[in-house]
Amino acid sequence: MTIKSILAPLTNATAKGFPLDTALLVANALRAHAEVLFIKEEVRENTRMALIAAGRPEVQDALRQLAASTRQEQESGHRLARQKFDDLLARHRIDYRENSIPGDLPSAFWRVASGTAIDEIEQHGSAYDLIVVARPEENVASQPIVEAALFGTGCPVLVAPPKPPKVIGEHVMIGWNQGVPAAH
């Protein structure tokens, strides 16, 4: 199987790990196109909390402040992750473009989505040859992302190591459930 398209889903919680570094390293090594998908997870107000807050201005104010703080953290995390992406492109000399050009040099693109990481990965992940995710033991928040990639797409998944590798492919572990979706 030739790997020419790579998806690297990131959220605020997983951007501090190394899936971005690993995805761009793989793209560079395989002359592939990596799409980094930064998912701004929606701030959802808990219905039960909203009902409890009904008629209590102090609780409503606290919920509004929490939602505003979460949105601010999302924006800050997005800016930091995008800066890291731009720095890595320059360091690895990877072209920034929306689509790959067959047989060309490695390339990468940054896309932003709103929603949940699980939904985005399950909806779009199967369109890629490889999905690179953060290691769940290092980042508990990445566990649902790993599961969505593994079980929701049928695509090969590369779990990024806890530290960015200097080279890719020296140590490899393959897991396969012999299911039809995993056989492609």
Task: Pin down the residues of each PLM region.
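Acidic/glycine-enriched edge-of-secondary-structure segments
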Residues: 106, 145-148, 170-176
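Short glycine/serine/threonine/alanine-rich loop segments
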Residues: 32-33, 94, 155
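Short secondary-structure transition/capping segments
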Residues: 53-55, 80-90, 143-155, 183-184
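Structural beta-alpha unit
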Residues: 1, 43-44, 52, 69-131
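Gly/Ser-rich helix-loop-strand patches that form or flank binding pockets
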Residues: 16, 20-22, 110-112, 118-165
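Small/aliphatic-rich secondary-structure junction motif
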Residues: 1-67, 164, 168-184
